[in-house]
From Swiss-Prot:
Protein name: GTPase Der
SUPFAM superfamilies referenced in this protein's UniProt entry, alphabetically: P-loop containing nucleoside triphosphate hydrolases
Binding site for GTP 2: 185-192, 232-236, 297-300
Lineage, highest ranks first: Bacteria, Bacillati, Mycoplasmatota, Mycoplasmoidales, Mycoplasmoidaceae
Domain of life: Bacteria
KH-like domain location: 355-439
Family: Belongs to the TRAFAC class TrmE-Era-EngA-EngB-Septin-like GTPase superfamily. EngA (Der) GTPase family.
Species in which this protein is naturally found: Mycoplasma genitalium (strain ATCC 33530 / DSM 19775 / NCTC 10195 / G37) (Mycoplasmoides genitalium)
Its job: GTPase that plays an essential role in the late steps of ribosome biogenesis.
Amino acid sequence: MFTVAIIGRTNVGKSTLFNRLIQKPMAIVSDTPNTTRDRIFGIGEWLKRKIAFIDTGGLIAKQTPLQQLIALQVQAALSQAKAIIFLVSLQEQLNSDDFYVAKVLKKNKDKPVILVVNKAENFNPKTAEETLKDYYSLGFGRPVVISAAHGIGIGDLMDLLVKQNQLLPNENNDDLAKIRFCVIGKPNVGKSSLINQLVKQNRVLVSNESGTTRDAIDVPLKVNGEKFLLIDTAGIKRKGKINMGIETASYIKTKLAIARSNVILLMVDGSKPISEQDEVIGGLAQAALIPVIILVNKWDLVLKNNNTTNAYKKMLKLHFKHLDFAPVLFISVLKNQRLNTIFEQLKIIQSQLETKVATPLLNDVIQQAQLYNQPPLFKGKRLQITYAVQTKSQIPHFVLFCNDPKYLHFSYARFLENKIRENFGFNSVPISLYFKSKNARIRTKPEV
């Protein structure tokens, strides 16, 4: 996917622009410098073309321990980007940090840099040459003038990015397959060996040394006539230890791979206890809000009895509490055991993602659920759901209209979720329920 890194000094509006480009409030926006320390990824769309954006921390010339880490993360983002937005501010004069950023970007000679002047709400096109003359000194030509906060000039910027994308070799891998899945997990759980088994050839470096796979590699697959796209990533080390360039790059590549996927394979080592590191990686899978398959590898090394499998599943639920929808497959990559079940499960998930529930049937289930189990009282008032509908989304998404969302208890939301799962076969995918007042236009979160 065409990937663009947003680079600039502190407090020029990078996160505001990022949120505008992906049309979602993912990044924290603050007037405080260095608010964005970890990299944030999102996908925007313009003229039916998808573009991945990387939000980055502010680069400054002064080298502190924090700034050195941010610089490493920015370099990793630059290594993944195919184009760069260099963001500066019209509300402040250019300073030494802007020129420092320009110097860093000039080292990436093989990638186009678009100079963007932000915070230009009061920009007057009639005096453009006089206003912008200082920005030419950065060495990146005529700037694009925008206001990220007000949406001014964003269309022109997106047009430029689409043109840059068209100049690059065409990459169709994302569009070849309905199912795009990535494999994530801590280093040395067998991810690379799994991919080698699935594609029947050595596409990635395999070693007993922890963390030997560095790049995200797209592997188009065709199984029984079905097209899949497998996105391999490096194993994720503990986030606190991601302080060297190569591991920072691996972490970024993993999150980019997740952003491009519609299914995640979360791989754990069945011969070892679930670790805190596994739980952190499980949190990444949960946060993606897409289907997850848990692969328990090295199952051939486990001594078993009649209860071993069920006991392990219960243990997984304790460690991955919010992934209870995720199917669990017990495999051995080394012995090539039960690997075919991965593609079988992927097809089941795809079928569930494509399931559309007829509105009358959905409302019958919701009304019957309310008759069977009334919502609990909230300050003497009871929730009443009058209408429900499934809306288009990446995962099954249901909007439930009610008298007042504040009467909803989280346990009743979970009860309704389970009823929808039971009646319509959504047993292997996450689903989302939004509760709205009958007269409201915005989402209201349930009170817990």
